[in-house]
A protein has these predicted regions:
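Sec/Tat signal peptide C-region and signal peptidase I cleavage site
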Residues: 15-19
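Sec-dependent N-terminal signal peptides
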Residues: 4-13
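Conserved functional acidic sites
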Residues: 20-240
Length: 240
């Protein structure tokens, strides 16, 4: 009887533990659902363009199809792959190399969390300076190399925020922090970008901070809380 009781307790404990753990598919948080709209607001608008056959999606910042941030994804990670250099020439861009050539791993594809728990740091990825090289392209083929130094990403949440506009009040969000020019212990990072992510809407807020006297000081922000009609295609003459 005692053995049966202990086995029952173990089974119940495993069941409760399994029930308390879930995973976010970060692709759902970083892309807008395809219902013929894009996000606009007080700053730069954003169109999400999916290219699933090539394992990419684009955060397009203009109806003409560029500039853009290009993210790659697979079953393990989402990578920061390409960003613009010039807002007027899609043949200029920065290509992030990363540890495997796909770019900087900014998030696991699936992030575990405990439903109902208080907001917390869910994940951290550290990237050594040897893996933050990038190409600055002045044309499709001509480029020079540079480096971000030590870098890291953090995923925090889930939060419940009311960001106004067309976004539902008290809606679950995640914060993706991207920090670079850190010291070798991944502290004192000189720059921090924060992306506020909301399922079905994608990146709804962007903030840029710089480290000053040990504190992060906001330099620039962009809120995208209005769902506006209209789609676009990504224009990228230098790759398929």
């Amino acid at each position: 009887m005692r053995l049966r009781f202990l086995l029952l307790l173990i089974l119940l404990s495993n069941t409760l533990s399994s029930a308390q753990t879930a995973k976010f598919d970060m692709l759902d948080w970083m892309t807008m659902d395809p219902f013929g709209s894009h996000m606009s607001g007080t700053g730069t608008p954003m169109w999400t363009v999916m290219d699933a056959p090539h394992g990419k999606f684009y955060w397009v910042k203009s109806p003409k199809g560029y500039p853009w941030d290009v993210k790659s994804f697979d079953s393990n990670f989402i990578y920061d792959t390409i960003t613009e250099v010039s807002w007027s020439d899609p043949q200029t861009f920065k290509r992030h190399i990363g540890p495997n050539g796909k770019g900087y791993p900014i998030s696991p594809r699936f992030v575990p969390y405990v439903p109902g728990a208080a907001p917390t740091k869910l994940w951290t990825i550290t990237i050594p300076s040897s893996s933050t090289n990038f190409e600055i392209h002045s044309s499709c083929s001509q480029y020079r190399m540079s480096n971000l130094g030590y870098a890291k990403t953090e995923i925090w949440g889930p939060f419940y925020e009311s960001l106004g506009g067309d976004l539902p009040p008290n809606t679950e969000t995640l914060h993706l922090n991207w920090l670079w020019s850190c010291d070798s212990s991944y502290n004192n990072c000189k720059v921090k970008e924060r992306f506020t992510l909301m399922r079905a809407y994608g990146s709804v807020k962007w903030e840029n901070y710089k480290l000053s006297s040990g504190q992060y000081v906001l330099q620039q922000a962009s809120l995208r809380n209005v769902a506006s009609l209209g789609v676009t295609s990504a224009v990228h003459p230098c790759w398929n």
